[in-house]
């Protein structure tokens, strides 16, 4: 996938579609690409395209399409963040084709989606997405939802990224080779637009942390803010590599003083 920054910048959640069925060639491309998706945690994610009428699926915030994609993954310690990375790769590929998506976690009849995904005993379906061609105009409901979560707003660069430690905010001017990749992290979507990622840049590495939002519900097997972290890691990794940065993924906690939760790092080779 080339021009990754273009797709990240231009993508938005789409809840209002134009009613056309996806072209068969587009469906085939999506299905084929989904089979190639990998994440740095080496945990496979299975994708399935599903027709709402066939499987009895319902999502009250989506209009104009009957097609959805679900993802499933075997539950493990890193399952949520791995899922977020892989599912965002699918979302960005759909964007590259002009196909709209919207992350769905709670506003759906989850049991029907899970049944359609044919989960095994240790598998979970963290999220799904609608798929379709975006309508030219949003519905009133969609406009109100976006306004309610301030969907087009993002936190300032200096509140998300830090220079060496959490005591020193990182400016764009000092971000150096990491600037583009960090900016694509800043633009990433997140549940209710909470933007829970915090990133510390050291000499030759970038360390990702989760700063949990107060009152944000989670269960043992479903952690939406960990999924958000996977999205952030995906944006960083794809952008850095498109900029020809030779980086490796690792989970090696640098033990920085913080109340945030360490997730993973990327280091220059």
Predicted segments with their positions:
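Acidic, surface-exposed loops and disordered segments
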Residues: 1-269
